[in-house]
Amino acid sequence: DWRTARIEHAREVRDLLGGDYYVDYADDNFEDGKVVKLGDIIAYHNETTVDWLGGFVQANYTTDKLNLYGMGGISSIEYSYQDWFTVEQELVKADPIQTYQVKGGALYNVSDNLGVFINTGLVEKAPILDNVIDYSGNVATDPDNEKFLHNEVGVNFGTQKLGVRVSAYDTDWQDRNLTKSVSTGQGSSGDTDIIFLRGVNQKHQGLEVETKVKPNDMVELDFIASFGNWKFDGDAEGTYQENEYNDEGQVVGYTTTEYQYALNGLYVGDMPQTSYIVGLTVKPVKGLRLQALYKTYDKNYSDW
């Protein structure tokens, strides 16, 4: 499977707010500023490309009681960056980044009603372009791939009137690359600074329960519960990118500072770690389905 993308990034003048022109200082090819009008490009103008090549194989083995599944894959991604607002307009290319993934699972049917299963997988994800080539055209040396190591075990039980699935999981998410925005209120439009984080590790553990009760053909009762414990595992390094402004409040460059970010032990935010769902479905006549759901969420920590 081969895919390619070419993306142009630019900001365009759409409204002069009654003026005849605007002076932009972002283009280094115009030392004293560039007079722009409607439709002209300001602030930034660059082009990036992404080339992706990958493939995978999979296999499945089934008997009366046992089902085995496995797959393996490899991919390569290559980035380039060209800034039209620099004098050199150099085409910057990063070396191809290889990633791998291996997944496997097994289901054993103890009886007609009871089955146990296990799933495991190791997946790598290449860092995004922003973490490989920055706005100045600097290329990161040997950037780390994100890694997901996931293990899950569980049991299925089912009859004509009752179905139950219980599973426990443990996931190590290593070497994440995150981008965070910090509102500064500076500049002509209240621009934001950016933090590029490297080496962010998280551990996700939890238990999930799904139950379906069907006392007759007209009524179904569903109960789903999920109990998670997701935390950051260790601190991380980060580059703080701070915009620089001229007297008119326009961005004319930026400075970067390296920091250590104390993340160890913080809960992962912006997603509930505990949830309950109760549902009632009624089918009074053929073709008509009435459903009521009650959902509640807990341990939903704020992001940072």
Question: Language-model segments: what does each one mean?
Answer:
Residues W2-S111, I133, E237:
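Signature of Gram-negative outer-membrane beta-barrel scaffolds
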Residues R3-E12, S80-E88, I128-S136, R176-G185, ...:
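Outer-membrane beta-barrel translocator domains and adjoining extracellular loop/strand segments
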Residues T62-K65, D170-D172, F196-D303:
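Gram-negative outer-membrane beta-barrel transporters
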Residues D51-V57, Y100-G104, L149-V153, V164, ...:
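Hydrophobic, lipid-facing positions within transmembrane beta-strands of outer-membrane proteins
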Residues R3-I41, S136-D142, K180-F196, E242-Q260:
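Surface-exposed loop/turn segments flanking beta-strands in extracellular/periplasmic regions
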Residues W2, N109-G121, D144-A236:
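Membrane-embedded beta-barrel scaffold of Gram-negative outer-membrane proteins
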